[in-house]
Amino acid sequence: MTVTDSTPEGNVTAELCNWVTELKPSDIPADVLQRAKHLLLDGIACGLVGSHVPWSEQAAKAIDDYEPEGYCSVIGYNRRYGPQAAAILNGSFIQAVELDDYHSAAPLHSASVLLPALFAAAEVQSKGHRKSVVSGLDFLVALVVGFETGPRVGSAMYGADLLSRGWHSGPVFGSPAAAAASSKLLGLSPDDTESAVGIACTQAGGLMAAQYEGMVKRVQHAFAARNGLFGALLARDGYVGIKKVFDRSYGGFLTMFTQGNGRTPQYKPEEVTTALGKEWQTTNIRVKLHACVGGCHGQIEALEKLQRNYPDRFAVDQLHNIRRITVSLSEPVFAHDGWAPEERPLTATGGQMNAAYIGAAQLVYGQVLLDQFEPHALDSDAVWSLIDKTTCVHSSEFDKPGHLCGARIVVEFNDGETVEDVVAMPKGFDPPITDDEIREKWRKLASSVIDSERLQRIENSVLSLETSADVSELLALISGEL
């Protein structure tokens, strides 16, 4: 189905919720559904790998100390909690190592928001007081609803602008996305879906200062999963949320989160439903090949090109001959990741959000994966020597749509020679990562934490999910100790 532009009354909130309720599997193109399955597989891979890193285990212990036992499963653990606690843990696991998906125009990590909400909602349906089975196809349709909602809400707020101003955009855009997806899976009416979205939106937030010293950045997308799930569970029993939350000029979601952005118009509510059902944001969700913030992937690839083109100059034992490195970034990426480190060593989160560290790690280790954020790397003399020589700057050449994750690298050497390279759009954005490459990434990550038989069973289950009568079969495979 498709929808028209917003009504004269300007109620794009109702239009979105009507579309959510009425969307049928046959409305979704086959390639979109196929991509959704691969994004699900990628999210599960990230959750499995992230479930037992130190900060995830600390979160799991803290929640286990105070949460009673429930019926919702947790990735990588033999424990069950209530739906909100399970959503918090699963979301924090998927975001734990910065390998999960991202949307480059309206920045959010969709899997870490949607999978936790939908896993819990499915188990509420199948194991709660009103028992009913959720099919794999029903799950996938709800997942597509979330994939479509988050980026559209973000576009109504000028996408990455929120990130430039210090908000953690993903938990903001992600809260209504999780509500819409959960509402679809729970079978809510348009009116109740609108309540769920309103309840989620009034809880939304997230501060980007979380990227420096703490661990809490890992859990902020999980807050959005919880917000949306909670909104849908309340609305399912008739609890009324904010209506017209995207349309209200006083205290509305778009109005408040765009305060002070200096834009005209301040926000664009029509973007919430523009081309809904015609153009599919699911296929615009990007899959990561590097274990760091998506905005720095262009920088990594520019450095990779320099390393290939000038192997003698960039040999590890010759890096001391570098005099200066200048990294040019888009406005939102510079604001987010171009900061100068204030202390050594950085935390793992700080390293994954810092362009100078990311570039230095690429030069020293030839890759930016999980090992580059272990303590030995975070305090490496070779890395810090290059960090001290790195300056990040804003360049408007990357501010145009579609180029926010690009970068230009200029390297000056002690002998006076200068080399440079530029990547306008990193791989994963243009060209996008293929489904074959996602499966390859899944196998590489999953094989590090589970045996080959379990890996294959999960892969088979996900890639044939539309034929499954009960999604709980998949949930049983991904829960349980690793």
Swiss-Prot record:
EC code: 4.1.1.-
Catalytic class of the enzyme: lyase
Keywords recorded for this protein, A-Z: Lyase
Organism superkingdom: Eukaryota
Pathway: Secondary metabolite biosynthesis
InterPro entries: MmgE/PrpD_sf, MmgE/PrpD_sf_1, MmgE_PrpD, MmgE_PrpD_C, MmgE_PrpD_N
One GO MF term: lyase activity
Pfam family, one: MmgE_PrpD_N
UniProt function note: Cis-aconitate decarboxylase-like protein; part of the gene cluster that mediates the biosynthesis of oryzines, natural products with an unusual maleidride backbone. The two subunits of the fungal fatty acid synthase oryfasA and oryfasB probably form octenoic acid. This fatty acid is most likely activated by the acyl-CoA ligase oryP to give octenyl-CoA before the citrate synthase-like protein oryE catalyzes condensation with oxaloacetate to form tricarboxylic acid.
Similarity field: Belongs to the PrpD family.
The protein's name: Cis-aconitate decarboxylase-like protein oryM
